[in-house]
């Protein structure tokens, strides 16, 4: 099976079922008659920009990250406001704390923008490490992000 065909099936499965793990995705693919290794699924997830996000019931599930027609920078700033609980800077890194299950989503938005201030991101459940080329650039990024974080308690 071609990669594009497999990825089309993955997209369909993720939109139809609340899949939360690679194992669940592999089981659904197998039920569709598609055999794929965990490494292949992992590559597909990365290439397709699939992220874990909470659904309407608060359960974590895979979703395909897609930008809308909205200005991507505006989407970043809105997401910073909505999901970031705090941000700290250490040398050339910014550590962003988010609401649970939002780390990967925000990191995907940051990565998708290809900002020159960002050398790379490392995301977890509710924390993102954003690496910048140097301390000065990291400070500028910190100030930009911090200005869009909600200070409501």
From Swiss-Prot:
* Protein name per its UniProtKB record: Arginine regulator
Task: Say if the entry is tagged with keyword Zinc-finger.
Answer: no
GO cellular component term, pick one: cytoplasm
Instruction: State its role.
Output: Regulates the transcription of the arc operon, involved in arginine catabolism.
Q: Which UniProt keywords apply?
A: Arginine metabolism, Cytoplasm, DNA-binding, Transcription, Transcription regulation
A single MF term (Gene Ontology):
arginine binding
Q: What is its main location?
A: cytoplasm
Task: Kindly list the biological process annotations in GO that this record carries.
Answer: arginine catabolic process to ornithine; protein complex oligomerization; regulation of arginine biosynthetic process
Say if the entry is tagged with keyword DNA repair: no
Q: Which pathway or pathways does this protein act in?
A: Amino-acid degradation; L-arginine degradation via ADI pathway
Domain of life of the source: Bacteria
Q: What single Pfam family name could you report for this chain, choosing any that match?
A: Arg_repressor_C
- Organism ancestry: Bacteria, Bacillati, Bacillota, Bacilli, Lactobacillales
Localization: Cytoplasm
- Similarity remark: Belongs to the ArgR family.
